[in-house]
Amino acid sequence: MSRQKTLDLLATGKTLWNKWRREDAEVQAFEPDLHGADLHGMDLHEADLTEANLQEADLREADLRETDLRHADLRSANLSDAHLLRARLHGADLRGANLCRTNLQGADLSNADLRGADLDGAILDKANFDEANVSRRDLGEADPNTPLKAKEQRAGSVALLDVKAA
């Protein structure tokens, strides 16, 4: 399916999108190509974006509550001010993503790669960072009220943290 057709289908709404992803056998093996898409402010609450290519996508202020983004490619995506409450981001690639002021309360970021992601001002309350790949500098000015447990590991000259909300 062409990138434009994928965008057009997503624009019809999450209900039709999720039905299409769930019921069409050919689609179940399909990784949606939304690379560089302008999804600014879009309501994608509970959408199935599993394994989607959202690299460099504009998701500013998008409603991604409870959205399934497992194993999605979100490298260099702009998610600033997005709402990701209870979003499923297990195994997602968020390297270089802008997560400034993003609400990640209760989100599952286990096994996610967040190296180089900007989490300044992010709300991380009850977010699961189990086995996530995050460096100290990536946490920046993330919500200081979020109790995080971190286990430092060394990989070359970079200090990596396995971070998990307490």
What residues fall within each predicted segment?
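P-loop NTP-binding cores centered on the Walker
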Residues: 1-12
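Tandem repeat scaffolds
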Residues: 8, 16, 21-166
